[in-house]
Curated annotation (Swiss-Prot):
GO cellular component, one term: cytoplasm
One of the GO biological process terms: base-excision repair, AP site formation via deaminated base removal
UniProt source species: Brevibacillus brevis (strain 47 / JCM 6285 / NBRC 100599)
Protein name (Swiss-Prot/TrEMBL): Uracil-DNA glycosylase
Keywords: Cytoplasm, DNA damage, DNA repair, Hydrolase
Length: 229
């Protein structure tokens, strides 16, 4: 199983793939992919780990579970494939980016450019049934992604954890705030964005922290034209 990960996540997660809960999770997923329409495609489940290496991670943006509509999810929280209209939460993220850092809003919602710079866009649950949000809650993914958060917390180099909404903020209990920077606000969803997400300036605050630690800032501006990688 560890051959799925071809970067420095492989050794740090090797033991996790052998644990009984993960063996059970893998069997559940095998059955689900054979009998249901599951997102993302099984080859994209670990995109967040493939694109953002363990030692290169600078920022973690936690999501909940993948988009459950056709063609949307590709393994990064909040991101959608090229050619897919940005969903409402991402539209609000773009609005905050524009007001925070002068972001030029693209037509797409493909966030690979961030992931490659060290922004880990991690959902706490990595798969979902088509049209059924939270359908893979409690099958084992939370244990796996909690382990990822613990491993990142254990790193010497400080990180920024961006926690939007109560679900993500539950993970703050794992994070050493003496070392890492936690930015917590309401979720960018249209239901909550006006309660404190807008105006929270998470992107400039992230770069201020990285700069203060002598780390490379994130270029939040996305390319205007993208192709799926």
């Amino acid at each position: 199983m560890t051959t799925i990960l071809q970067n420095d996540w492989a050794p740090v997660l090797a033991d996790e793939f052998e644990k009984p809960y993960y063996v059970k999770l893998r069997q559940t997923l095998k059955e689900e992919y054979q009998t249901q329409t599951i997102y993302p495609d099984m080859f994209h489940i670990f995109t967040a780990l493939h694109l953002t290496e363990y030692q290169n991670a600078k920022v973690v943006i936690l999501g909940q579970d993948p988009y459950h509509g056709p063609g949307q999810a590709h393994g990064l929280s909040f991101s959608v494939k090229p050619g897919i209209k940005p969903p409402p939460s991402l539209v609000n993220i773009y609005k905050e980016l524009k007001s925070d850092v002068g972001f030029e809003i693209p037509q797409h919602g493909y966030l690979n450019h961030w992931a490659k710079q060290g922004v880990m866009m991690l959902n706490t649950v990595l798969t979902v049934r088509r049209g059924t949000p939270n359908s893979h809650k409690d099958i084992g993914w939370e244990t796996f992604t909690d382990r990822i958060i613990h491993l990142l917390n254990d790193r010497e180099t400080p990180l920024v954890f961006i926690l939007w909404g109560k679900h993500a903020q539950e993970k703050a209990a794992f994070i050493d705030r003496n070392k890492h920077f936690v930015i917590a606000s309401p979720h960018p969803s249209p239901f909550s964005a006006n309660r404190g997400f807008f105006g929270s300036r998470p992107f400039s605050r992230t770069n201020e922290f990285l700069r203060s630690r002598g780390l490379q800032e994130i270029d939040w501006q996305l390319p205007m034209q993208v192709e799926e990688e």
